Amino acid sequence: MRKIYIHICAVLLGLAVISCNHTNQRQQTGNSGTAISKKALKDSTVVKQTVNTAAQVYAKPEVPVLCYHRISDGPKSEYRVSPETFSAHMKILADSGYHSILPDQLYDYLFYNKTLPEKPVMITFDDSRAEHAEIAAPVMEKHGFRGVFFIMTITYNKKNYMTTDQIAQLEKAGHTIGLHSWDHTMVTKYKEEADWQKQVADPKKKLEGIVGKAVEYWAYPNGVYDHNGAEELSKYFKLSFSLYSKRDSAVPLQSVRRMIVPECTSQGLLKSMHRTFGR
């Protein structure tokens, strides 16, 4: 009887040891799983993108930004180049190794330090003239260039100006559509909330309906920069473009400088770019 009792105790002790070992194994497995899970979480953590301060944006080398207005034959003017001259300008840019960039690329370069192609240049157009779609765009596309077209929404579907279909087609072809106000009223005259609604908020919404995407870039009417206006524009746009005005170190993203391109030779264009932007 005593032998049977001892045997039963031994069996029970063995079962207890097995149970403890199994529990420890489960705990170890669980701890290991937790450790793996934490490691995986750590490895999958997205590193936040570094952004530049206003001072850092202001310190970055400028990119040449060209601005064309009318592309037609007629009296010589700072705001007009002939179709032949425009074609020659695009050819010399291509032959000289320039690469056209769009505002998204410029913004990423200024704000996030993204790399730009060698010899970047931005080609922009103000006032939504019909010849921008009918003459300029095909010439640029022939050289692999894309441009930026700033639209006054009061003009579309009117004589000598782009139609809504042309605006949408430019966007589909890889160009960028920006806003140039409703009726070309200068930002310095936006005094009331109603002015901002009429010249910026409402036209922006209408233009977005035409192109089917956000409109994130602005060109100052008449190229006239305004510091107070720039602060307000930063609520609507990533970048705003002026003409010749000095950049504002407080809001450099809203004071991107452009150069008006007049009737001039191809070599004259390159010299003006170098003189204005240093490249």
Whereabouts are the PLM-identified features?
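Bacterial N-terminal signal peptides that target proteins for export
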Residues: 1-8
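C-terminal motif of bacterial Sec signal peptides marking the signal peptidase cleavage site
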Residues: 16-19
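C-terminal active-site subregion of NodB/CE4 polysaccharide deacetylases
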Residues: 24-124, 129-131, 184, 188-279
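Acidic (Asp/Glu)-rich catalytic clusters
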Residues: 58, 137-145, 162-180, 234, ...
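Short, well-structured secondary-structure segments
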Residues: 64-67, 99-103, 122, 141, ...
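Secondary-structure boundary/capping motif
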Residues: 131-132, 158-159
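Short, well-ordered secondary-structure micro-motifs
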Residues: 159-161, 189-190
